[in-house]
């Protein structure tokens, strides 16, 4: 494949993701507005549809603030790493064909999402501000903690599937979703994705009343916009993964509808994220950690052992493709 074609393929992936992220922010503001008995953005363009474009332009033409004692290289590298990891994670995902057909597709997705934690840590340290550092440490502790349960839940589903490829998950769910056999894991996965993406009620990284906006307190303009884009891209990615793992459309009679089915289910899951934000108050930090280490972790480990022992005892391990 020629370099120009590779670039074109990458752009065909990245541009729709960025457009989806832009309109997810508008949808969030509209939904929160209607749930609070007020209108959301309705001035810029027809029914406020051009509001994300106006917000993006405003952020990117702002002058970036560079604190005097901050580390300038890391300060710029942190948002770049965040947005790069958020875009790179889409490579193994079939839409309907993947950009990189990897044998260990799901494992690579987990590894790339873990790499994004470094951007938060770098941002807090490079700002040379105690508020940013405390915010980044809290965010990193939360993200790393919930990645443990995400990894174990992923392992439990892969034991039933018999491989790490996303295509195999699609074939496995031809007759029934994994949601029907693993609904406790699905619920824990969904709650863990809320915590992993720093969404309400687990938005402790941006607790304005406690942390002065968290790890990105020294960021403004373009670098702040990159963090913002990465956060919302990760929300879409996690919901897409939830759909692939537990409610996969599968190879139905109409394979051409696979992508439309996947997008529709992902949209519903994204809307549920916004509904949860409008409905629930923020958890305390100790409640967040208690939920993971004392409830989710023992339950996921027990279910993982159950799935493995069940498959072995009835000789039901699927063959590797």
Swiss-Prot record:
Transmembrane regions listed in the UniProt entry: 5-25, 74-94, 104-124, 151-171, 175-195, 227-247, 256-276, 296-316
One GO-annotated biological process of the protein: aerobic respiration
Pfam assignment, any one: NADHdh
Main location group: mitochondrion
Enzyme Commission numbers on file: 7.1.1.2
Protein name: NADH-ubiquinone oxidoreductase chain 1
Domain of life the protein comes from: Eukaryota
UniProt-listed InterPro entries: NADH_UbQ_OxRdtase_su1/FPO, NADH_UbQ_OxRdtase_su1_CS
Membrane topology: Multi-pass membrane protein
Gene Ontology CC: one annotated term: mitochondrial inner membrane
Subcellular location(s) of the protein: Mitochondrion inner membrane
């Amino acid at each position: 494949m020629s370099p120009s074609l590779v670039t074109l393929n990458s752009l065909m992936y990245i541009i729709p993701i960025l457009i989806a992220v832009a309109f997810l922010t508008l949808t969030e503001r509209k939904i929160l507005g209607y749930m609070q008995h007020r209108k959301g953005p309705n001035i810029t363009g027809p029914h406020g549809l051009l509001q994300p474009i106006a917000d993006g332009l405003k952020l990117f033409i702002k002058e970036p603030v560079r604190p005097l004692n901050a580390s300038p290289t890391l300060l710029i590298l942190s948002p770049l790493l965040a947005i790069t990891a958020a875009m790179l994670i889409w490579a193994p995902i079939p839409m309907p064909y993947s950009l990189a057909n990897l044998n260990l597709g799901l494992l690579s997705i987990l590894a790339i999402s873990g790499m994004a934690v470094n951007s938060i840590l770098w941002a807090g340290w490079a700002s040379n501000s105690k508020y940013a550092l405390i915010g980044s440490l809290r965010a990193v502790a939360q993200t790393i903690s919930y990645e443990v349960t995400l990894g174990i839940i992923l392992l439990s589903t892969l034991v039933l599937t018999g491989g790490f490829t996303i295509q195999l998950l699609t074939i496995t769910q031809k007759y029934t979703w994994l949601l029907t056999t693993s609904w406790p894991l699905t619920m824990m996965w969904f709650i863990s994705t809320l915590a992993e993406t720093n969404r309400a009620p687990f938005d402790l990284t941006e607790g304005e009343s406690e942390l002065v906006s968290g790890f990105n307190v020294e960021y403004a303009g373009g670098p702040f916009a990159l963090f913002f884009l990465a956060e919302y891209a990760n929300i879409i990615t996690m919901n897409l993964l939830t759909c692939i793992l537990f409610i996969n459309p599968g190879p139905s009679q109409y394979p051409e509808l696979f992508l439309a089915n996947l997008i529709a289910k992902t949209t519903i899951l994204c809307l549920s994220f916004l509904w949860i934000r409008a409905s629930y108050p923020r958890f305390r930090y100790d409640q967040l950690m208690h939920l993971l280490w004392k409830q989710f972790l023992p339950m996921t480990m027990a279910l993982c052992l159950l799935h493995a022992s069940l498959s072995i005892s009835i000789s039901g391990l699927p063959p590797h493709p």
